[in-house]
C-alpha cells in the first residue's frame, strides 16, 4: 500500500495568489477546459505529470494514451495520488488530487480502449504540469 500524499490546505485567497485565473477556475471551482485546447492532449514525452496546484506526482507518462477525446487521457494514477467521487447524478466519477483536492477531471470505465485497467482518466491539461524523465525518479 502506497503512502498517502501530504495534505495541502490553503484559503481561497492563497489559491488565487498561486494559480492563474484559469487554473483556479478548473482546480478550485471544478471547471473544464475546452476540448482540444490543452497543452498535454497530444503530448507524449517520458516523465511524470504533477498536480499544478501542489506539485504532487499524479501520473506516469507510460499510462497516458491517445483517446481522441480532446483531453489528456491516462489509464491509471500513481497509488494513493487520486481520489474518486461519484457525481450526484451517478453518470460520472470526479477525480481530484488526494493532497490538495484540486479538480483534475473525470474517470470513465468500460469504454473499450484496451488498456490494462479499462479506464480513461480524462484530465484537464490546466490541472497538471510535466516533469521530464531525467528529473524524475518515479518512472
Swiss-Prot record:
<feature type="active site" description="Nucleophile">
    <location>
        <position position="122"/>
    </location>
</feature>
<comment type="similarity">
    <text>Belongs to the MsrB Met sulfoxide reductase family.</text>
</comment>
<dbReference type="GO" id="GO:0033743">
    <property type="term" value="F:peptide-methionine (R)-S-oxide reductase activity"/>
</dbReference>
<feature type="binding site">
    <location>
        <position position="97"/>
    </location>
    <ligand>
        <name>Zn(2+)</name>
    </ligand>
</feature>
<dbReference type="GO" id="GO:0005829">
    <property type="term" value="C:cytosol"/>
</dbReference>
<dbReference type="InterPro" id="IPR002579">
    <property type="entry name" value="Met_Sox_Rdtase_MsrB_dom"/>
</dbReference>
<comment type="function">
    <text>Catalyzes the reduction of methionine sulfoxide (MetSO) to methionine in proteins. Plays a protective role against oxidative stress by restoring activity to proteins that have been inactivated by methionine oxidation. MSRB family specifically reduces the MetSO R-enantiomer.</text>
</comment>
<keyword id="KW-0813">Transport</keyword>
<feature type="disulfide bond" description="Redox-active">
    <location>
        <begin position="69"/>
        <end position="122"/>
    </location>
</feature>
<dbReference type="InterPro" id="IPR011057">
    <property type="entry name" value="Mss4-like_sf"/>
</dbReference>
<dbReference type="GO" id="GO:0046872">
    <property type="term" value="F:metal ion binding"/>
</dbReference>
<keyword id="KW-0862">Zinc</keyword>
<keyword id="KW-0560">Oxidoreductase</keyword>
<keyword id="KW-0249">Electron transport</keyword>
<protein>
    <recommendedName>
        <fullName>Peptide methionine sulfoxide reductase B5</fullName>
        <ecNumber>1.8.4.12</ecNumber>
    </recommendedName>
</protein>
<dbReference type="GO" id="GO:0006979">
    <property type="term" value="P:response to oxidative stress"/>
</dbReference>
<feature type="domain" description="MsrB">
    <location>
        <begin position="12"/>
        <end position="133"/>
    </location>
</feature>
<feature type="binding site">
    <location>
        <position position="54"/>
    </location>
    <ligand>
        <name>Zn(2+)</name>
    </ligand>
</feature>
<keyword id="KW-0963">Cytoplasm</keyword>
<keyword id="KW-1015">Disulfide bond</keyword>
<dbReference type="GO" id="GO:0030091">
    <property type="term" value="P:protein repair"/>
</dbReference>
<feature type="binding site">
    <location>
        <position position="100"/>
    </location>
    <ligand>
        <name>Zn(2+)</name>
    </ligand>
</feature>
<keyword id="KW-0007">Acetylation</keyword>
<keyword id="KW-0676">Redox-active center</keyword>
<dbReference type="Pfam" id="PF01641">
    <property type="entry name" value="SelR"/>
</dbReference>
<feature type="binding site">
    <location>
        <position position="51"/>
    </location>
    <ligand>
        <name>Zn(2+)</name>
    </ligand>
</feature>
<keyword id="KW-0479">Metal-binding</keyword>
<feature type="modified residue" description="N-acetylalanine">
    <location>
        <position position="2"/>
    </location>
</feature>
<dbReference type="InterPro" id="IPR028427">
    <property type="entry name" value="Met_Sox_Rdtase_MsrB"/>
</dbReference>
